[in-house]
Amino acid sequence: MNTKHIEILYEDAHILVCIKPHGVPTQSRRAGTPDMESLVKNHIYQSAPEKGQPYLAVIHRLDQPVKGILVFAKTPFAAKELNRQLQSHGFGKYYRALADGHPSQKEGTLEDYLIKDGRANTSRVCASGTAGAKLARLHYAVVEQGPFLFDQAPNDDAPRTELDIRLDTGRHHQIRVQLAHMGCPIAGD
């Protein structure tokens, strides 16, 4: 992926909103690995190289396998304001997921305590009193149910559910962990 292939939804002097494709990390610590932060920074630089290296702040992240909308701040003021809005729920985090199985309710709220294992890059549901546990809350609504085919299982007609998801919190692997705990893991996960 190069900067010509970034799908920009909105850009002004302060922010840039774009689509992050499946498989591209939001940020990467590995040199030579393309990531959205580097691609967007290169896009900004190429559009005005006379301004030098641009300022860019990632406002939120999406997991590498996830496709979705990313918001970047192009100025320190915008970064501060967008982070304030995110913390005060001035704008939300909305997702659409394809899950295996069918939830028992058409809509609901999941509240669990999650603990992160940084070395294994995993998270799991745990008891509320567990040291390091953090509250995770999401709301879901069924969009459609049926056998949906997707790239990782093109001949599989297992029951699946398309869900709209709104996060109140943004925990590590929150959606995949909470949906799996509910009995409806992300399809192909």
Language-model segments: residues:
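RNA pseudouridine synthases
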Residues: 1-189
